[in-house]
């Protein structure tokens, strides 16, 4: 019985394998015959050539290729393909039209007057085929074969020869529509737009030709001297319209001239820099007026209440011998003179106006601002011109200027103009030395004044970090994000002493910020373990809470008021109390932290972003993955100041800036900076800082004072509390919970067909290992990890 059962199983296996093997054999056979037919090998090859030429005529290769496609389908899919789908039907229609056109051409050549009777078409085709059988393949012209003869005979009988051409054209159009799966309007709309734009261009060229012809006829009647004066007058006419609307002449910012030449220019630049430094994102807060009090009574009362406050976290006192680094440590910028820049700008302005004119937009270029990497053209449209119409011409303007990409700012804030930003042919480097050496940096009392770069007008862009109060930096890899972070850190090291500003650096990538280890400004060594990072952020939150308790006991509202209170106390008492330093927390890669402990990190960042400003704690968060699961809505809502470097898509730009624009940046330090309170971002060329300059600054600072880390702020080693689970379904259950992003006992019972006890044990094990949250009544348990974390673990 066992042998009979085994034989039956083998026979059944043969029956199941036989159909698939049959299709493979048929497919390979057809493929081999097709190759033999193409090469016309032997009697078989020539016979198949005659067979296909009978039906397809001179286009017999189409039939052979169709058989090859059928054989490949047999081998791959092991079954009959659908030969009547929409795309194949379109292909059939086009082939029939080609065969009919070929047959019409054949019979026009064979007959003198081009007219043929209906019956003679098929008969003549058959006679030609028999004649070819006697002479051999390719000896007689067969036109479109029997298929073409049938199509031509039918159409000629019904619609005459011209009607046959019309029917063939209609078949081709229907075939294209079937293949592309579009209707006629969708196919013809781009053609109409192209024709309309070409007509407008031709109309503009015709007008230019007429004007040029008139000018040439006038110039022939004058001497060479008058011709030169005429050209000079024309050049002045080109420049004059750019000065009609604006009071000032066109501005071409020469940002390479860092130092003023005379006293008048010094005063003018100083006024401009003061206007820049008092912009909304670095606006100085007026001092808090405190009520006058008697120094004998109220300070004693507050000191008595302060005795019950928590102890101060920072005990290091001021180092009198510490000297701030000099700007001589940083390199001077290499001034690179760009030749023919004015001529290029005027030529681009003319191209812009001509392009606007060709599209029927009345607009004039009135001012030009040349920046380090981008030149901004201010375009004033006439009354009645929609701004959206100018914005829609961005691709056409880029084509006219032969630019890589352009960015349109519509409108420019505070002006009735549209800004068109065009990349320069030569990019000028901006160094941190020239930014920190500008007039805007003459505020030694501002310890958190950071240098970012130069804007399009060539002015240095600096910002007060304590007014931001937090900063989000995002951009793709290689766009200049790490250089910007280094510039911010070095700006702080150049202005603040260790007792004035403290730094906490979190670098999960372990390569960007390790160079700063040993700097006396650090609270702790650079944190590189993502698991320790959440603990470090929690310690900063605890420090913030302790500071608020100190403020409450001393009757002050913020760190500035508290430090003023301490200064007044130290002037009257022998027991000196240290002032509270600012704390700057720098996270170089937020995405890695969100993968390991998203909930803890997000909660800590949310609390610091909401409350830490008055306590003197400021966040700088950088990430190269600007997605919504990294830059969450909670983080964005509490960090209003943002810097966006070049990103790959408009979606990433909207995640960072709540609007487009970053996808059009050039990279290599080109950024969009949107400070707190600003309506639109400012385009800035970021300051470059080499690794050698960073190392020199770090060596100088370490040489002035050794690091004194705060033991209470150093995160401890995080023990892995996960326990091994003996249940073999545990890994599958975790995978299911992570994929579904929901967890419940009933779901595990249904999916794995287990009892309540076993499913409950699995849920308890997941809660113990930090996969799901605690029990919340009728609500489903919260899943604490995502799919990316599960794969990484």
UniProtKB/Swiss-Prot annotation:
Q: Name one GO molecular function term.
A: ATP binding
Q: Where in the cell is it found?
A: Cell membrane
> Composition bias, kind Basic and acidic residues: at what positions?
212-221
* Membrane topology value: Multi-pass membrane protein
Disordered, as annotated region = 212-235
Topological region Cytoplasmic: 178-793
Q: Gene Ontology terms, cellular component aspect?
A: plasma membrane
Q: Tell me which SMART domains the record gives.
A: AAA, Ftsk_gamma
Give the transmembrane ranges: 25-45, 56-76, 88-108, 136-156, 157-177
Provide the alphabetized UniProt keywords.
Answer: ATP-binding, Cell cycle, Cell division, Cell membrane, Chromosome partition, DNA-binding, Membrane, Nucleotide-binding, Transmembrane, Transmembrane helix
Classification via SUPFAM superfamilies: P-loop containing nucleoside triphosphate hydrolases, Winged helix' DNA-binding domain
Q: What residues does ATP bind to? A: 478-483
Return one Gene Ontology term, BP aspect. Answer: cell division
Record-annotated FtsK domain positions:
458-654
Which InterPro entries does the UniProt entry name for this protein?
A: AAA+_ATPase (IPR003593), FtsK/SpoIIIE/SftA (IPR050206), FtsK_alpha (IPR041027), FtsK_dom (IPR002543), Ftsk_gamma (IPR018541), P-loop_NTPase (IPR027417), WH-like_DNA-bd_sf (IPR036388), WH_DNA-bd_sf (IPR036390)
Superkingdom of origin organism? Bacteria
Q: What is known of its domains?
A: Consists of an N-terminal domain, which is sufficient for the localization to the septal ring and is required for cell division, followed by a linker domain, and a C-terminal domain, which forms the translocation motor involved in chromosome segregation. The C-terminal domain can be further subdivided into alpha, beta and gamma subdomains. The alpha and beta subdomains form the DNA pump, and the gamma subdomain is a regulatory subdomain.
Its job: Essential cell division protein that coordinates cell division and chromosome segregation. The N-terminus is involved in assembly of the cell-division machinery. The C-terminus functions as a DNA motor that moves dsDNA in an ATP-dependent manner towards the dif recombination site, which is located within the replication terminus region. Required for activation of the Xer recombinase, allowing activation of chromosome unlinking by recombination.
The family line of this record is: Belongs to the FtsK/SpoIIIE/SftA family.
Report quaternary structure and partners: Homohexamer. Forms a ring that surrounds DNA.
Protein's name in the database = DNA translocase FtsK
**What is the gene name?**
ftsK
